[in-house]
Amino acid sequence: LPAGDILNQVYSLPEVDKLTNIVFMGQGEPMDNLDNVLRATEILTADYGWAWSPKRITVSSVGVKNKLKRFLEESDCHVAISMHDPIPSERAELMPAERGMGIEQVVELLRNYDFSHQRRLSFEYIVFKGVNDSMQHAKAIIKLVKGLDCRFNLIRFHQIPDIPLQGVDDEKMEQFRDYLTQH
C-alpha cells in the first residue's frame, strides 16, 4: 500500500480519536513495503502530521536483512520480531523467511542497536503444542537473546480449521513464561 492508503486505514477507524498505539503487523511484511511504511510513520510522528511519539508505534517483521537494518537506522519506532522458534531448522518449517535471513542473523543485527532507552525491542512467539513449547526451546531462546534488552510476547495459538497445529494449555504457557522470566 502507498503511505496515503496506510494512513487512510488509521484515519478510517471509528475509534481514531481514542487510539493510543499503532502496530504494523498482520497485513504483510512491513519491510517489503519499507519506503511507504517509513513515510507513514514519518507523517504519524512529524509536527505537521499527528505529532505522535515514535514510542506509540511498533513495526513487526520476520527480519528482512537490509531492510530491517535500514528501518533501524531511519526510524525510532519500536520493533517486534516474529521469532516463533529459536531453532533455525524448525523455524524454517514454520516460517520460510528463515531461509532468507535466519533468526541468528536477525539477532546479531539487532545487537548493533540500543534498545535500552526510547526504542523497545520485542520478540513475538506463538506457542504451539509439541512444536516449540519445550524447555529446549526456552533455553535456546535465552541463549540466543542473551545480553539483548528485549521483551517476549508469548501468544496463545487459537485453532484454525484444517491446520494441524494446536495451542498449549495454561499450565504449559505459564511454565514457558516463567522460565523465560527467571532467566
Name the predicted role of every residue range.
Residues 5-180:
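Conserved AdoMet/S-adenosylmethionine-binding subsite of the radical SAM
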Residues 1:
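Local cysteine-cluster metal-coordination motifs and their immediate loop/turn environment
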Residues 183:
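Conserved dinucleotide-binding and phosphotransfer motif residues
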